[in-house]
Amino acid sequence: LLAERGLTERDIKVINLDTGSTQAALVSNGVDAAFGGRELFKLRDKGLIDIIYDNPSQDVRYTRQTALVVSSDYEKEHPQNVQKVVDTLVDAAKWSSDEGHAEQVFAEWAKSNDPVESLRADFAGSSLRDKVSPLVDNFLIGRYQAVADQAKAEKLIRRPVTVEGWFAPGYLQAALKSRGLEHYWTPYGPDGKQPAADAVAVATSKQGS
């Protein structure tokens, strides 16, 4: 985001704080500004801070990704358990992707201390189906590689890191196929744009190899 506007980390003084400390620092004027997520909406709604940038164009480069991690040893010893977990997550993603369930989804997520109003604000202008997609597509893999490359460029790590071999999409593909959901979610290319139909087939083939 800084580079997009011709800035570098040397143009600002960066302090690494956890979420709670960041909010406290903002409210007490301990910092001039902060990067954050949906947790900042509740401070804005209380009139405690102003939000000057909120990714209005939904640029996927400024999004966060999450993944389910399993150790290699456990996966080899208990593949059926791994499949059960992935199956359950796919079922949950399918239900959560239905816009008709949006308020129920937000109410459930609000149990983690994110106000429903903040969740609504965070998801404004975007679809639940895209947001909760479980796909391991070229966009997801590309984002992990981009972060690794940036860490090397910023000298946070000494050696380049490749994410090749980090992902095992076989369990996901099995879950999607058994539920007839192979084409329910849209796979995206590295730039976050929907690839052509033939590109999807190539990406799926490579990931499953």
Model-derived features: where do they sit?
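Ligand-binding cleft/hinge of the Venus flytrap
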Residues: 1-12, 44-46, 111
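Residues at alpha-helix termini
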Residues: 5, 29, 46-47, 154-155, ...
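Short helix-initiation/N-cap motifs at beta->coil->alpha
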Residues: 7-27
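A generic structural signal for short
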Residues: 10-11, 135-136, 180
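Residues that cap or flank secondary-structure elements
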Residues: 14, 31-32, 139
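Pocket-lining segment of extracytoplasmic ligand-binding domains
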Residues: 21-112
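Secondary-structure end/capping motifs
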Residues: 77-161
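Conserved C-terminal helix/tail region of periplasmic/extracytoplasmic solute-binding proteins
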Residues: 149-209
